[in-house]
Amino acid sequence: MSEAIENRNGRALVGVVVSDKNDKTIVVRVETLVKHPLLKKYIRRRKKFTAHDPNNECKVGDKVKIIEFRPVSRNKRWHLVSILEKAV
């Protein structure tokens, strides 16, 4: 099923898992760099996304790729595509 998900159009983000306490759910923190309009300095912005992890394979600290998907629940609109790097 992950191959079908990878081929979908939509936003794909890379982030770090900060929580895996819920069943089949992970919380992923995504960091982006935004240029400040006045200071012309890059600022690190962080946002948390709740993603669906059907096999409960992610652990805290894993670097993962998530993709925008149909709503699974009230807060989950993202789906785990792959684990890029396992936590030590």
UniProtKB/Swiss-Prot annotation:
Keyword annotations from UniProtKB, A to Z: Ribonucleoprotein, Ribosomal protein, RNA-binding, rRNA-binding
Encoding gene, per UniProt annotation: rpsQ
Keyword RNA-binding attributed: yes
Task performed by this protein: One of the primary rRNA binding proteins, it binds specifically to the 5'-end of 16S ribosomal RNA.
Any one GO molecular-function label of the UniProt entry: rRNA binding
Gene3D superfamilies: Nucleic acid-binding proteins (2.40.50.140)
Lineage: Bacteria, Pseudomonadati, Thermodesulfobacteriota, Desulfovibrionia, Desulfovibrionales
Similarity section: Belongs to the universal ribosomal protein uS17 family.
Coiled-coil region list: none
Gene Ontology process terms (BP): translation
Protein name, per record: Small ribosomal subunit protein uS17
Endpoints of the signal sequence: none
Entry-linked CDD domains: Ribosomal_uS17 (cd00364)
The protein's assembly and partners: Part of the 30S ribosomal subunit.
The organism's place on the tree of life at top rank: Bacteria
